[in-house]
Regions:
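Surface-exposed strand-loop-strand hairpins of Gram-negative outer-membrane beta-barrel proteins
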Residues: 1-5
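Outer-membrane beta-barrel porins/channels
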Residues: 7-9, 15-302
């Protein structure tokens, strides 16, 4: 059985044109999270099946964005509220804790800014977006704290994303993105640990995506994509960071109804990078692991 639990999330977004130059949008989505359960999972670390860590953490974002167009150029700006849901972290059994740490949720507000260039006659769009970091200080009880209270610290890094798309033939679109985040400076430290000895062991990431879309008919379109995140650290010390980069392939089909509603069904297959984790004096190799994700999107244009 996998030490990674199944995860489901619900996203929504809406956009409307205030006038011919200004558009306003609202989006809610899952920004980050961790869902691990080594207990009974057959961990490669000897003896950890009974006392290994179990965590459940989710960070959701609510973004309000505006876009102002000036001929072929546009400016993007807005705010993003990142919220950590109430969480649990059963990670101190090896240190003698009888209960899991209970972490109270919290939120932080950041900014989003970007610019874009468009050439509609060839479906060209190039967009550069910057998102500021979010930091959290979350009251925590249980675990090694017992009835006492201390703060768990966590943060989500600033993101720099370059998106592009362009028509390359009739009814055929090439698209892609590059996304960077300095995760090495944004660790999770479940109280009573500190950022000097964090719970996590995240590494900086650069993610590349390339894909192609094809319109088959007035009703049907298909897409295929390849995504990769560079491997940076094939060894680590945190059981919450058991992978090192990944490669993924994805495919989707889009069906458009007569009223303009679009229904998209997609699947993604990821091959995550191998990593050796050393914790409490023993080492385990995580290798040949895969992740399958699927999703359904419904969009209505009016």
């Amino acid at each position: 059985r996998s030490m990674l639990d199944d995860v489901s999330s619900l996203h929504f977004a809406t956009k409307f044109d205030a006038n011919e130059n200004l558009s306003i949008g609202l989006a809610r989505y899952n920004q980050a999270g961790a869902s691990h359960n080594y207990q009974g999972a057959g961990s490669p670390l000897p003896g950890f099946s009974a006392v290994g860590p179990s965590t459940e953490l989710s960070i959701n974002a609510l973004a309000v964005l505006g876009r102002y167009s000036m001929d072929d150029f546009s400016a993007i700006g807005g705010i993003k509220i990142s919220t950590v849901a109430d969480a649990t972290a059963d990670i101190f059994k090896l240190s003698g804790a009888a209960t899991a740490a209970s972490i109270e949720g919290g939120s932080d507000t950041g900014l989003v800014a970007g610019v874009a260039y468009e050439k509609p006659e060839i479906a060209l769009r190039v967009e550069l977006v910057y998102e500021t970091e979010a930091s959290f200080s979350l009251p925590t009880t249980g675990g090694l704290l017992g009835a006492a209270t201390a703060n768990t610290t966590a943060s989500v890094p600033d993101y720099r994303t370059l998106n592009f798309q362009s028509g390359i033939a009739e009814d055929t679109l090439l698209y892609g993105s590059i996304r960077q985040a300095d995760w090495s400076n944004h660790q999770v430290a479940v109280a009573p640990q500190t950022q000097a000895a964090p719970t996590s062991d995240f590494s900086d990431s650069t993610t590349y995506t390339i894909g192609v879309g094809r319109k088959i008919s007035d009703q049907w379109s298909i897409t295929a994509s390849y995504k990769t995140e560079e491997a940076t650290e094939n060894t680590g010390t945190s059981l919450l960071s058991p992978t090192d980069g990944y490669e993924a392939i994805g495919a989707a089909a889009i069906y458009t109804l007569e009223n303009g509603t679009e229904i998209t069904v997609g699947v993604n297959y990821s091959m995550v990078g191998d990593k050796t984790v050393t914790s409490s004096g023993v080492s385990g190799l995580y290798s040949d692991n895969t992740v399958v994700t699927s999703g359904i999107k419904v969009a209505y244009n009016f």
